[in-house]
Amino acid sequence: MAFLALAAASPQAEKAAILSVIHRMEDAWNRGDFRGYMAGFKNPDVVFVSGGKFQQGWQGTLDHYVRDYGGSPERRGKLHFYNMKIDLLAPGAAMLIGEYRLIRGARVTEGVNTRLFKKFHGHWLITMNHVSAYDVTPTATAPEAH
């Protein structure tokens, strides 16, 4: 009887796969593809925490993005994730903490994301997303965010 051994991906490969999810999400947002952005989150089971409260879940969050950021590039803005650090917690589980910047005309928002990733059928998805955000004053800019 032959056995097929599946080699676990290296830690570097797992981290690269997680970063690839984030880069695809950023690209999707910046081209106005909110459903593509949301593809990085576990549907429907993702938990969103922002502004000191739980958000509306996957579909409610998609609806919020379309309503509040859709319609034009100016409303959507340009999103950039940076300074990301990934901790592999266990096989199939990882935590990412990173920063982001969203430029919408004269309004610039920066913040921190804490994201719990789990691997489902070989694909990394965000199962918990916590955001802490603030509006940037015109003179305060993060060098990594440009």
Where are these regions (language model features)?
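Sequence/structural signature of outer-membrane beta-barrel proteins
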Residues: 103-105, 135-136
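Short beta-strand edge/turn micro-motifs at domain boundaries
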Residues: 110-137
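Short, low-complexity N-terminal intrinsically disordered segments enriched in polar/charged residues
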Residues: 3-43, 137-146
